[in-house]
Amino acid sequence: MKVSFFSRRAAKNAGWLVAGRVLHMALAFLVNLLTARYLGPSNYGLVNYAALYTAFFTSFATLGLSSLLLKDFMDDPEGAGTTVGTAIAMRLLSSTLSAVSILAIVAAVDRGERLTMTVVALYSMSLIFQAFDTIQYWFQSRLESKYATIATSVGYIIVSFYKVLLLVLGKDVRWFAISNTIDYAVAAIVFL
């Protein structure tokens, strides 16, 4: 009887994770399609250039802690608060160092390209807010991904509306570059 209860909880937990991903992918597809058409190849390429650096450095910024955190949360649920705090502090440090590294590389590679530097700087700030994703692993370990999914979905819905508003208002590429950072910032605020 206990096994079926656990399986049901695990299935619900997985369902929330899948639903969140599907929502995120559907919104991303629609909004990115509109954004790409609006920005054009040059500016959309610039945003993707910034995204490339950020994606590469994300592996350094996260420190590979996800599986370790899940295991630690399951092994020591009472110490979860300390674990979350320590992991967030570690990730804030590594994220800040990663963002600074990105800026140093881009400054060396793209000398004099002020727009490129600005877009990359705005986009790479998202690494700092990604440190708060650590809380999501705590929810996953407790089979309560519903709350983490709601937090990240609220953030992404807000950012999707923000991007559509930017399209309507005719804003430039800098405004789109910061949208990724706003996505993670809103999720971090909702998590806290």
Which role fits each region the language model picked out?
Residues 1-27, 78-81, 85:
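N-terminal membrane topogenesis motif
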Residues 6, 54, 91-192:
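Hydrophobic transmembrane helix module of multi-pass membrane transport proteins
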Residues 26-43, 167-171:
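Helix-terminus/linker motif at the lipid-water interface of multi-pass membrane proteins
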Residues 37, 41, 71-75, 107, ...:
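Transmembrane helix-loop junction
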Residues 42-45, 81, 85, 117, ...:
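Residues that define the loop-to-transmembrane-helix transition and helix capping
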Residues 59, 72-90:
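Specific pore-lining/lateral-gate transmembrane helices of multi-pass inner-membrane transport
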